[in-house]
Regions:
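A short acidic/basic microdomain associated with nuclease active sites
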Residues: 82-106
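Acidic active-site catalytic centers that drive phospho-/nucleotidyl reactions
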Residues: 74, 102, 115
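Metal-dependent nuclease catalytic core centered on acidic motifs
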Residues: 83, 119-155
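Active-site beta-strand-loop-beta-strand hairpin of nuclease catalytic cores
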Residues: 105-115
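Charged, low-complexity intrinsically disordered tails and linkers
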Residues: 1-56
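Acidic-basic catalytic patches of nuclease active cores, encompassing PD-(D/E)XK
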Residues: 54-89
Length: 155
């Protein structure tokens, strides 16, 4: 699959409806600025490893915000690391757990695991898979920017 979005003629220029999920809006809206967004997302998607495209596409198209935004964030982070010159392995196996982080990124002698997390709130509660913090094991380095918390650990 080389596209996330449907190959359709778009004529609806109306803004997003209050009840409309993000993907449905992006897929239907017919304005030039949103066409550029679709083209950019599809370009990133074409560079994503083919073996993992079906899963990512399904989650990106999901009406559940946690799935949609999680897939969007994974695609963005994957593209970022690739453009920074890193090799990116998707869902690498770990020796100490059956869980798999989103990526193992490496360049030269530098390697790190990356887990992409999107926290959404609805009426004061965290939504999404598990509803809590995910941990891959001891992480001695923690960076809290106030917006994003990053835990760094050598791979």
């Amino acid at each position: 699959m080389s596209t996330i979005f449907d190959d359709i003629e778009r004529r609806d220029r109306s803004p997003a409806l209050h009840t409309e999920d993000s993907f449905s809006f992006l897929n239907r809206v017919a304005t030039p600025e949103w066409q550029r967004v679709r083209e950019l997302v599809d370009a990133w998607y074409r560079d994503y490893p083919e073996a993992s495209q079906t899963d990512l596409r399904g989650r990106f198209r999901d009406s559940d915000a946690a799935q949609h935004y999680g897939a969007w964030w994974e695609l963005y982070v994957y593209t970022l690391f690739r453009r920074l010159g890193y090799d990116v392995a998707i869902h690498p196996a770990l020796l100490t757990t059956t869980r798999q982080p989103d990526f193992l990124v490496s360049r030269g002698e530098t390697a790190m695991y990356v887990e992409c997390v999107v926290a959404l709130t609805r009426m004061g509660t965290i939504s999404g898979d598990g509803g809590g913090e995910r941990s891959w094991g001891p992480c001695p380095h923690v960076v809290d920017t106030g917006f994003v918390v990053m835990r760094l650990r050598a791979a």
